[in-house]
Structures are given as structure tokens and as C-alpha cells.
Amino acid sequence: MKKAGGQAQATICYTTSPVHTLDSFVELGHRLAEMGADELCVKDMGGFMPPHEGGELVRALVQKVGLPVVVHTHSSSGMSGMTCLAVVEAGASAIDTALSPFAGGASQPPTEALVGAMRGTAADPHLDLGALAELSDYFRGVLEHYRPLLNLRSLQTDPGILTHQVPGGMLSNLLSQLREQDALGRLAEVIAEVPRVRADLGYPPLVTPTSQIVGVQAVFNVLVGRRYGEITREVRDYVRGLYGTPPGPIDPELRQRVTAEAPAISGRPADLLAPELDRMLTEVRALVPQADVAEALSYALFPAVYRSYRESADRGLTPDVLTSIALGVVGALRAPRPAPAAPPRATSAWSQAGRTHLGTQRGWVDAHHARARR
């Protein structure tokens, strides 16, 4: 990648545990630099990195590792704006933000607010607030267009993350799993089980894929009624070392149960895999003759999803069309309607959604909502 002119940014996932300390993060930064990283990114996936700790971490990385440091956080807990200012003052070379229509909640802090907060300081980014306002006005329209598809929970601040430290995306997955099992009333038990499973697995940071590995096992432990009464395949692979070396030691009893059935591996897990790109290209070109390497990589990562996507695309159901249908259906279901004087004539939301080709997607949705309000 670097030979092709790219820049290698290596990520340090911020988390807290008995094995995650300032010194351990700096040591990881040194290892990443030795591997050839051009810059470091501190990823606060849960949005619970306090301003003072963020500042201390960035300052230590800049001074002791010597690489530029980017900070990526989320507004989930409400601290992100304060944390961003603290890390900039500590020497961060960049922070990730989002334009105000898409900021806050599970997203990043607003670009405009931080530009205003840093104006006149040594870290002034010299961005035109007027131009940013124009961009925000445009994307506010985009936001309204897709509002029917938004999960309102993802737009809100959740200070509870400061105590349970379960990132928003992971919490959504837990809710979905419990809803499927008709067990939403046991969410508190699962939330309490998550840190126990995480400790058993050596305190991995709760970020994809380990957040799903920990979360699913926590759900199993609660619903089965016995801890590790059923061990998921992903936990077994993790314990055996197929996801790399854990930050801390794995629970000895759990390790013994897993490795008694299949031995642990040593070394780099990817070295156990045979080269597969040529095979993937052959398989994907059986579906799409003109497929390139990018298509093959998509197929390799998500084979079932890719096949479904290609089958839908062949029928004309491209992402744009599917989005329009979803917008129409959700908009029809959510639109406020006055009590009718007489029984209304049945209307098919699908037939309405199929009329998107008569005009732009946004124009059709606006017209559809106007009809619903009449």
C-alpha cells in the first residue's frame, strides 16, 4: 500500500480495563510505528473517553512515539466536543467531525461548533463558517429525505454508556437479539453479563468484531441459564487464537474447555489461510463476467450478501430503488392521518412506492406525504 503512494494509519482502540493503561497504549504505539505506520488514530468507539484522559493519551503518544495522532470519537455520551478540544490542545494533528445535520448521538461532534470553538487559537483550522453553513443547509434537506429510515435512538445522547460502556452499535445488536427471542425484559441482565464475558476473554476492546463476539455470548449465558452452557463458534475461535492475541489472559477454565476440543494456534492467524483471490475472482465472474478485484473482495467478505445483491440488481432492484421503496413504505406508515369520515379505500404502499420513476425520489416522497396529510 505504501509502495503505491498510500499512507498507513494504524488505529489504537481506546478502552478501559486492568490491562489497558497509558503505558500499554504507548507501547502499542511504538509497535505500530515499528511496523511502518505513518500516523496513529485513537479510536474512541464508545464515546466515553474523558477529556483529561484523551489529552494525556494524545500528549504521551505525540511525545514518546513521535507520529501524528488523529482522534476519532463519538457523541454517544455527550463528552465528544470537550474531548476533541482537549486532544487538540494536547497536540492531536486532526479530529474527526460531522456537519451538524449528521452530528451528535452515535455520530461525531458538529464541525461548525468545533471550528467556532478553535477560531483564533493556535489550532484554528481556518475553515469558512459561511461555506459550512451552506453545506449544512444542503445536507439538512438530505436528512429530511431519509428521516423516515432513521433510528431516533442513534440521534440521542446516552449517558448510560459512561457506566456500562456498551457502544451504541453493540447495544442495538443486543436489543435486536433479545427482541428475536422475545426477551427484551432481560436486557439489564445481559448488560451486566457483558463485562464479565469481556473479562473472561482477556478484556478485548468492544469494537467490531469482538463487540459482537462478547455480546452474543453474553446473551447466550443469560438465556441458556448457565454461563457458557453453550459456547459460540466465534468465542471458540477467539480463545484458540484465530482473532490474534488477547490484551490480557483468558479465563483458564474457559480456555481448557475450548482447547480440549481443538488446539490453540500460535503465530499469525492469517498465515494459516491459503491464497484465495484467484478462486474468488473465478466464482464472482461466474455471477458477473466483467467483475474486477473490488467485486471479488466484496464477494470474499460477504458472499451471501453479495449474491443477494447481484440477484436483486439483475431484477432492477438497485440500492436507489430499494431505498425509495423503503422511504415510501415507512413514510406512509408514519404519516399523521385525521380520522376519516368514511372507511378509507385500501391503498397498497408497494404500488405507491413503485411510482418513484415518475419523478425524483425526494419529489415523490414529498408528494406522497402531502397526499397522506390530505
Roles of regions detected by a PLM:
Residues 1-69, 85-92:
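Alpha/beta enzyme core
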Residues 22, 70-72, 355, 359:
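Intrinsically disordered, low-complexity regions enriched for glutamine and histidine
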